[in-house]
């Protein structure tokens, strides 16, 4: 089975982003650090189901608009944004 590099990258970046209470409201204690899938989806303007499919490798061809939304939601710098786009093209 091929590795899901795009999904692995998304999951790692999601874990690295601190939730912002001004944007997300409900910040109950978390079992794991970072954003929840639903929160990334909300911030990126995607459905939670679609984001989950991307992260799990069940959808591998996101549009440029989706990638830009994810880059903003995950607070990616220029280098990480370029890496995200490269992974999406390779998937």
Question: Predicted segment positions?
Answer:
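Short amphipathic recognition helices of helix-turn-helix/homeodomain-type DNA-binding modules
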Residues: 1-11, 62-91
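A short, Lys/Arg-rich alpha-helix, primarily the initiator
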Residues: 1-35
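Short helix-loop boundary/capping segments at the starts of domains
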Residues: 15-19, 45-49, 60, 76, ...
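Sequence-pattern detector for short linear motifs
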Residues: 16-17, 40, 56, 84
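Residue-level detector of alpha-helical recognition elements and their boundaries
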Residues: 21-25, 55, 66, 85
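Recognition helix of helix-turn-helix/homeodomain-like DNA-binding domains
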Residues: 28-31, 37, 44-61, 71
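Residues in the helix-turn-helix
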Residues: 39, 50, 80-83
